[in-house]
Amino acid sequence: GVQLLSVLSNCPSLKLFVNTGSFAEYRLGVQQFDSAYLYSATKTAFRTFLNYYAGLYAFKYITAVPYTVYGGNPTVKRLMDYIIESLDAPAAIEMTGGEQILDFIHVDDISRFLIYVIQNHCSFCMLEKNGEDFHLGTGRGTTVREVAKIIESVSKRRCNINWGARAYRDRDTMYAVAPIAKNIELIQWKAQIELKVGIERYLNKQ
């Protein structure tokens, strides 16, 4: 990341940099950084370098904070993929208790946000605060178990999951729902794909 910023510092046309954060940077709420995992801690650490370069080379930046992403053609297996994999599986998939309340956002909404930023980059450059965070989610929380039930309802198949077979990690995020009011007030943007519709779309691509 720092190498990228160093290269971009030689680009005089750079006006806006879009950083990507993680909801796991806010284990105890969005008021302060408290990373749940090492990965999210590196995201928080990078912000210091980004702020330094932005001040030194006078460019604007924002941070997009995706919540629990699903859909598309994932390069890594995500939470929802494990649930889908359990459908009518002969052997039960071991998971935690599934009580986490998460905000599931379809990858198409993430893409739409990035396109929106590109199309409206001048407006983002005029934001009063440099380094503004935009939390990308629907603003609605759903437990992992509830997601499994929706998947069963949509697919007409049964999830074979052994709930509680795995322990929660010591700093697991148990509640992560995007605060979306700022998105609506500052940039007039919100996610469009409801969870059930997104799951239907995702299952149809399987």
Model-predicted segments: where are they?
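Hydrophobic positions on the long internal alpha-helix
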Residues: G1-L8, F49-L50, F113, V117
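Conserved Rossmann-fold NAD(P)-dependent oxidoreductase catalytic core, especially the SDR/UDP-sugar
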Residues: V2-L38
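Active-site beta-alpha turn of Rossmann-fold NAD(P)-dependent dehydrogenases/reductases
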Residues: V18-S22, V65-Y67, E99, G137
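Active-site helix of classical SDR
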Residues: L38, T42-A45
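NAD(P)-dependent short-chain dehydrogenase/reductase
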Residues: N51-L102, V107-I118, I150-E152
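A recurrent short beta-strand within the Rossmann-like NAD(P)-dependent oxidoreductase core
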Residues: T68-V69, I93-E94, L102, L114, ...
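Conserved C-terminal active-site "lid" loop/helix of NAD(P)H-dependent oxidoreductases
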Residues: V107, D133, A167-V197, R201
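C-terminal "lid/loop" region of Rossmann-like NAD(P)-dependent oxidoreductases
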Residues: N130-F134, T143-A148, K156-Y175
